[in-house]
């Protein structure tokens, strides 16, 4: 117990750090957002009239920005995102770099597009290199997480170089266990709970707004928790200018991990404090699993990873014990892990919706002690071992990322 409660290296302090590192407010898909942030930071060091902006990124960042809506525009494209970030983005906005986008700047953005070049390289980890040229030259690098400005170089002079190994962040998360998470949520810190409350407010609001709109996937599905999840994701992917609380680098994961336990708890008239603990459980389980799969991967995080988190939370709300919560996670992962990520887009709404339905089903099964047996495929008896196997299987899917880019945007 003392290891959990005391000291800066205690499990409690580690969970706090993990939470605040992985739960942040954003406008729009986080990959165009990250590119936009690099541009906004670079602009602050630029002198004179802009000549060019060159951005080279890892292939997963590129994949996720091709077909997703840019906030406030309903339009697609990295060149547009870069131009808008240059015009209205501010470094202090962080992942909210697009929050000032409006129709009046669109025409100016189109005038800048000829000065913008975008390409990608076969890097497995999140890595964005943005070079801006005017009377001087500025280089900005983002690595490992969407708002980690790791390098700033102005006219060859290094202003910042804070390279942090992606393995350090992963190892920090891997140093805790699901049991540590279960213990923490029963006595969470107040500032953590306050962020959870914000996440509930923003993400449920997005779902409620989306489900009202004809043409939205959630509107078409009509009712039920999966429909609301689809509605929120579709709002975001379609380019609505709405704030979303991200989880482990993804707004869709934020919606898929926060909305289901919230609506389940409220439908069953549970106390808000209990719902907040459940949502925190969902967030932390999702973040924990993502430490093994990686931030950007060939695997659909909203459909298969966040749904494991929400199933844990729903099982908790329904009175499940620790073993049943773990079995719910295992049931989801053993069923949906093969769902791939073929880029951020409106169709993500349906993947998240399917994941949510499975989260509900997995919880029902776990509560009746009816679970996928170990040895069925990659399912292990211990969910922690299943998660470790997923880490290995994710790496085996890397060829998918290389091939799928050729199809995105082509009918």
From Swiss-Prot:
InterPro entries according to UniProt: Ser_deHydtase-like_asu, UPF0597
Coiled-coil intervals, chain numbering: none
Similarity comment: family membership: Belongs to the UPF0597 family.
HAMAP family to which the protein is assigned, alphabetical: UPF0597
Organism: Fervidobacterium nodosum (strain ATCC 35602 / DSM 5306 / Rt17-B1)
GO molecular function, one term: L-cysteine desulfhydrase activity
Protein name in UniProt: UPF0597 protein Fnod_1278
Record-level GO BP terms: L-cysteine catabolic process to pyruvate
Top-level taxonomic group: Bacteria
């Amino acid at each position: 117990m003392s290891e959990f409660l005391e000291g800066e290296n205690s499990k409690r302090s580690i969970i706090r750090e993990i939470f605040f590192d992985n739960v942040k407010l954003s406008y729009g898909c986080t990959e165009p957002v990250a590119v936009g942030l690099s541009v906004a930071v670079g602009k602050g060091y630029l002198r004179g009239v802009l000549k060019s902006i060159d951005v080279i990124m890892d292939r997963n960042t590129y994949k996720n920005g091709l077909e997703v809506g840019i906030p406030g525009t309903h339009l697609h494209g990295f060149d547009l995102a870069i131009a808008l970030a240059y015009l209205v983005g501010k470094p202090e906005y962080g992942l909210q770099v697009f929050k000032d986008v409006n129709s009046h700047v669109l025409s100016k953005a189109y005038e800048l597009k000829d000065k913008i070049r975008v390409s990608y390289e076969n890097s497995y980890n999140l890595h964005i290199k943005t070079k801006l040229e005017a009377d001087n030259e500025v280089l900005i690098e983002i690595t490992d997480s969407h708002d980690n400005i790791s390098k700033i170089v102005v006219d060859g002079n290094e202003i910042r170089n804070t390279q942090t190994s992606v393995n350090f962040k992963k190892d920090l998360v891997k140093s805790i266990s699901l049991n540590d998470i279960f213990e923490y949520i029963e006595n969470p810190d107040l500032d953590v709970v306050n962020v959870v409350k914000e996440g509930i407010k923003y993400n449920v609001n997005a779902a409620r707004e989306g489900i009202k709109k004809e043409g939205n996937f959630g509107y078409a599905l009509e009712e039920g928790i999966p429909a609301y999840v689809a509605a929120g994701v579709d709002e975001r992917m379609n380019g609505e200018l709405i704030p979303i609380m991200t989880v482990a680098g993804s707004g869709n994961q934020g919606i898929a991990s926060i909305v289901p336990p919230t609506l389940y708890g409220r439908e069953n008239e549970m106390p808000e404090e209990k719902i907040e603990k459940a949502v925190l459980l969902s967030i932390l389980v999702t973040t924990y699993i993502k430490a093994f799969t990686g931030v950007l991967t060939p695997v659909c995080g909203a459909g298969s990873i966040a749904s494991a988190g929400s199933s844990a939370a729903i099982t908790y709300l329904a009175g499940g014990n620790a073993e049943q919560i773990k079995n719910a996670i295992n049931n989801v992962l053993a069923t949906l892990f093969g769902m791939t990520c073929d880029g951020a887009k409106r169709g993500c709404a349906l993947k998240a919706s399917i994941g949510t339905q499975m989260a509900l089903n997995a919880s029902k099964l776990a509560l009746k002690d009816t679970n996928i047996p170990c040895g069925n495929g990659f399912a292990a008896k211990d969910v922690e071992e299943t998660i470790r196997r997923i880490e290995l299987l994710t790496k085996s899917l890397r060829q998918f990322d290389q091939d799928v880019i050729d199809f995105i945007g082509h009918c």
